[in-house]
Every structure is written in structure tokens, then in C-alpha cells.
């Protein structure tokens, strides 16, 4: 609470100083726009995460439900949260495990390690046994970015736990997206400039069954391009050195050097085509040589931040850090300008954007010592937690609005505040 009281006092002082210099204006104290809210505690973090799992995890299947109204996560059209959001929920479980370990709480550490194992097993069983060539539209893989979000989290899981299956699945899925599937018949997400496709990554293949090759003017979205960079760099950080390059037409692995080169290539294309480098704004997409679609989405800002941080750490080149800072500044100062809180979007699944942002702003703060964002992050947590459903301890996506007790809350919106809490201890 101290930071809000201090801010309010500073604004009050500023208002008095301004008034004293203008005799024609009535001197009056500054009235804060927002009520002061209490600060969350580390104990609140565990309350929030336990509540998220209690109300939104299918405890039988170990995948997450779409909302509290769903009794079970049956399938895509019957209660299961979106396939591309499930890995973010797995990220949250891994962050809970790491947090418990850092706190020296062995009971919680064991509990959340088991949850991590259960979530992988549950998702694998539900999503076609992680057969990335299965393109059924219910429990299969039919959009490139859906696969790539899993590629990223599987690589992070290998980094944390060292389970070879996680690395194998991550690399297999990366190759499936990049090169396409001989079984499905798509030509891959990579828009090879040497084939006249213009560079970057295509978002989808169409039709889903018996697809046509992508063409240069097809959509290249930020949500596939920057996650591809994150995946490539995370794999670069974790695969062994000394590999021999595969000569297969659809390789199941890359060398360390190839992952770095691919990450750099896609990043360069995406920055040139999807980023306003003067502001840090990320466009949603671009089709061919048309103008970028300048629509703000927090998760696009987030994956750009993450890609930039990873390239900065891999190369030491400051341009990448500068890009990450500019993107974070734009997110904090422009996108979040209305309430000085991360915005809420009402589209299906868009509530998860804060949870995606949590992962990458934490990397910028803690891996790159950019601690200037901590007050903003904690402001979001404090408002979201203060306005939770007090009975169920579930948060919504509009952090400035009180949740109606007992109302339906979707897992996407409910994930944001606990995701931030798990990565940002109250006392640091």
C-alpha cells in the first residue's frame, strides 16, 4: 500500500505547487482517480493459485476447463479450454513448482511437481497423444500457432525437469510447424524468401484437410512469428552442442546453430514487418505487402518482449534489450493507459493475454534487471486481487471491477492475476 499512498501524496503536492503559481485558479487538492487498495501477500499467491485449480482444472483429465460453468473438459466444444492456452496453464504449474522450491516448502514443491507431471500426461492423452500430424479439429492440431505455443512450453519443461521426452516433443513440433507435414500435406509455416514467399511465418494452412500451399500474400501473424523466435531460442539454450545437421526434408531436430539462425531470421523479418520501432507497438498481422494491422494485443507485445530478451541473452547485443524495453513501455504507458492496468479484451480466449505477459515481463525484469516494471505489475495484481470473487478467491479479467460472487468466470480471464503472482513475490 505504501507505493499508492506515496504516489497519491506526490500528486497532491504537485497539485498544490501548480495551484500556487496560478492566482486565477482556485487552489484545490488533487483527488486520486483510484481508490487505494491493499497490497497482496505471498500467502495470497497460494490462495489465488489453489482457487484457480480448484474451480477450473478438470481433476479427472488434468486439462483445464473453459469456465466455471463447465463440469468437465470433454473436448473443444464441450468444456475444454483452448488447445493453445493449455500450455500457459502448464507454465503456471511449473512456476508454482519453482516458487515453492525457492520458498523451501517441500510439501508444495512435491505437490506442484506432481501437478506438472499430471498436466503433461492429461494433455498428451487428450490431444491425440501429441501426434502433431493429427489435424482433427476437435482434439488435434490444425493451426500453426497452436502447435508453436506447445513447442515453447515443452522446451521450458525440458529446461526445468530434464525429461528427454519433453525435448523430443518440442523439437518434433518445431519441425512440424517449420517444414509442414507430409501426412497432412501442408507446406509449412516458414515463408521461404528463396521461394518467393517473402519471409516470416504463416499463421495457418487452408483448407485444414487437403490444404493448398501458402502464398506470399497470406496472413503472417505476430502470434506465430514471435513465439517461433521464443521457441527457437529456448531450444538453442537446451539442445546439445556438436550435432550434425539433418539432411531429411522434414528434420525432427536442428543443431544449436540452426536454432539461433532461425530465431534471428524470423525476428528480423517480424520487427521489420510487424513492429513500429519508434514506439514499440506490435501489429497483429500483415498480408503480403499490405499495411500491417495495427491492432494492439497484450500477448503480441509479450511474445515480442520474450523474443527480444532471449536474443539479448544469447548474443549480448543491446538492440534486442532496447526493443524489449520499448515494447514493455508501450504496453505499460499506452495500451494500459485507461486505468493504468492491463486492458481486458472480450474476445474468446483473450483473457489469457495477461498470463502470457506475466511469463515474459518476468524475464525482462529478473533476467535483464529491468525492475522499473515491478510497480506496474504489482498495481495490476493488487487491483485484480482486491476485486476478486471473495467467496471463491477467483479473479476476473477486468481488474478495476469487482467480480460478482458466484458468476461464471472463464479460465482465461481467471489466469492472469495468479500467473503474475507466481512470478512476482510480494516482498521483492
Where do the PLM segments sit?
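Noncatalytic carbohydrate-binding groove/subsite architecture in carbohydrate-active enzymes
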Residues: 226-227, 231-295, 302, 307, ...
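Bacterial Sec-dependent N-terminal signal peptides
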Residues: 1, 7, 14-39
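Aromatic- and glycine-enriched pocket-lining scaffold segments that form the walls
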Residues: 167, 171-265, 269
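Mobile, glycine-rich extracellular loop/lid and propeptide segments
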Residues: 141-154, 161-164, 169-173, 177, ...
Amino acid at each position: 500500500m505504501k507505493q499508492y499512498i506515496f504516489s497519491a501524496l506526490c500528486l497532491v503536492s504537485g497539485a498544490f505547487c501548480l495551484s500556487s503559481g496560478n492566482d486565477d485558479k482556485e487552489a484545490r487538492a488533487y483527488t486520486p482517480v483510484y481508490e487505494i487498495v491493499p497490497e497482496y501477500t505471498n500467502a495470497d499467491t497460494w490462495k489465488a493459485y489453489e482457487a484457480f485449480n480448484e474451480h477450473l482444472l478438470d481433476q479427472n483429465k488434468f486439462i483445464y476447463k473453459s469456465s466455471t460453468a463447465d463440469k468437465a473438459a470433454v473436448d473443444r466444444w464441450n468444456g475444454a479450454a483452448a488447445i493453445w492456452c493449455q500450455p500457459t496453464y502448464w507454465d503456471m504449474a511449473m512456476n508454482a513448482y519453482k516458487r515453492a522450491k525457492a520458498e523451501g516448502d517441500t510439501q508444495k514443491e512435491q505437490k506442484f511437481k506432481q501437478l506438472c507431471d499430471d498436466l503433461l500426461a492429461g494433455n498428451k492423452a487428450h490431444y491425440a497423444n501429441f501426434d502433431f500430424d493429427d489435424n482433427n479439429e476437435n482434439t488435434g492440431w490444425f493451426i500453426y500457432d497452436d502447435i508453436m505455443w506447445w513447442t515453447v512450453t515443452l522446451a521450458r519443461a525440458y529446461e526445468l525437469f530434464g525429461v528427454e521426452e519433453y525435448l523430443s516433443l518440442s523439437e518434433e513440433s518445431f519441425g512440424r510447424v517449420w517444414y509442414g507435414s507430409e501426412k497432412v500435406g501442408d507446406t509449412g509455416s516458414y515463408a521461404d524468401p528463396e521461394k518467393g514467399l517473402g519471409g516470416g511465418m504463416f499463421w495457418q494452412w487452408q483448407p485444414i484437410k487437403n490444404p493448398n500451399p501458402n502464398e506470399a500474400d497470406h496472413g503472417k501473424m505476430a502470434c506465430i512469428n514471435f513465439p517461433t523466435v521464443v521457441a527457437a531460442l529456448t531450444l538453442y539454450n537446451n539442445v546439445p552442442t556438436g550435432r550434425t545437421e539433418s539432411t531429411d526434408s522434414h528434420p525432427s531436430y536442428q543443431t544449436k546453430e540452426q536454432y539461433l539462425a532461425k530465431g534471428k531470421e524470423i525476428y528480423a523479418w517480424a520487427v521489420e514487418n510487424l513492429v513500429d520501432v519508434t514506439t514499440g507497438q506490435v501489429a497483429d498481422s500483415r498480408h503480403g505487402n499490405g499495411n500491417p494491422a495495427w491492432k494492439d494485443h497484450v500477448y503480441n507485445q509479450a511474445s515480442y518482449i520474450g523474443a527480444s530478451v532471449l536474443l539479448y541473452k544469447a548474443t549480448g547485443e543491446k538492440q534486442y534489450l532496447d526493443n524489449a524495453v520499448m515494447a514493455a513501455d508501450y504496453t505499460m504507458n499506452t495500451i494500459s493507459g485507461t486505468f493504468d492496468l492491463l486492458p481486458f479484451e472480450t474476445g474468446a480466449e483473450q483473457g489469457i493475454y495477461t498470463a502470457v505477459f506475466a511469463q515474459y515481463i518476468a524475464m525482462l525484469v529478473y533476467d535483464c534487471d529491468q525492475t522499473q516494471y515491478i510497480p506496474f505489475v504489482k498495481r495490476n495484481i493488487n487491483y485484480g486481487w482486491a476485486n476478486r470473487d471473495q467467496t471463491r478467491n477467483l479473479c476476473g479479467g477486468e481488474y478495476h471491477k469487482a467480480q460478482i460472487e458466484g458468476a461464471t468466470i472463464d479460465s482465461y480471464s481467471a489466469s492472469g492475476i495468479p500467473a503474475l503472482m507466481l512470478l512476482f513475490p510480494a516482498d521483492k
